[in-house]
From Swiss-Prot:
Keywords: Chaperone, Cytoplasm, Protein transport, Translocation, Transport. Homotetramer, a dimer of dimers. One homotetramer interacts with 1 SecA dimer. It is found in: Cytoplasm. It comes from Shigella sonnei (strain Ss046). It comes from the Bacteria. Belongs to the SecB family. It holds the Pfam family SecB. One of the proteins required for the normal export of preproteins out of the cell cytoplasm. It is a molecular chaperone that binds to a subset of precursor proteins, maintaining them in a translocation-competent state. It also specifically binds to its receptor SecA. This is Protein-export protein SecB. One of its GO terms (molecular function) is unfolded protein binding. InterPro entries: SecB (IPR003708), SecB-like_sf (IPR035958).
């Protein structure tokens, strides 16, 4: 009976925190006089590390760059971190948990932080759409499988 309990999947959020915030408006104040039709670019990255047995830190980095033509209106980067207790899974399931499930939890916090910082820069409201981290993770796995196939073909 105790062996069964040890293999059960457990997941617990220990802490969610803002690890880093950066905001730049390099062309302020003259950018405020321009028509606000920005091109908005969103970059995402995740990283994870094991802190202790069954304890992991996951950091979601979200970078938003708004440009008006060739000029950068603003650049905002947030690193949203979380510490999670995860046990009873391994391999691809653990990779999915750290690379998709945890970022899904962290993204709303990062999105709120970015929205707040951008509004403090007196730019119009920025509403980031939800991100499907499960689909991004599947794309990543497909790319990794494709790269592995290419390496075998080259050999």
């Amino acid at each position: 009976m105790s062996e069964q309990n040890n293999t059960e999947m457990t997941f617990q959020i220990q802490r969610i925190y803002t690890k880093d915030i950066s905001f730049e408006a390099p062309n302020a104040p003259h950018v405020f006089q321009k028509d606000w039709q920005p091109e908005v670019k969103l970059d995402l990255d995740t990283a994870s590390s094991q802190l202790a047995d069954d304890v992991y830190e996951v950091v979601l980095r979200v970078t938003v760059t708004a440009s008006l033509g060739e000029e950068t209106a603003f650049l905002c980067e947030v690193q949203q971190g979380g510490i999670f207790s995860i046990a009873g899974i391994e391999g691809t399931q653990m990779a999915h948990c750290l690379g998709a499930y945890c970022p899904n939890i962290l993204f709303p916090y990062a999105r709120e932080c970015i929205t707040s910082v951008v509004s403090r820069g007196t730019f119009p409201q920025l509403n980031l759409a939800p991100i499907n981290f499960d689909a991004l993770f599947m794309n990543y796995l497909q790319q990794q499988a494709g790269e592995g196939t290419e390496e075998h073909q080259d050999a």
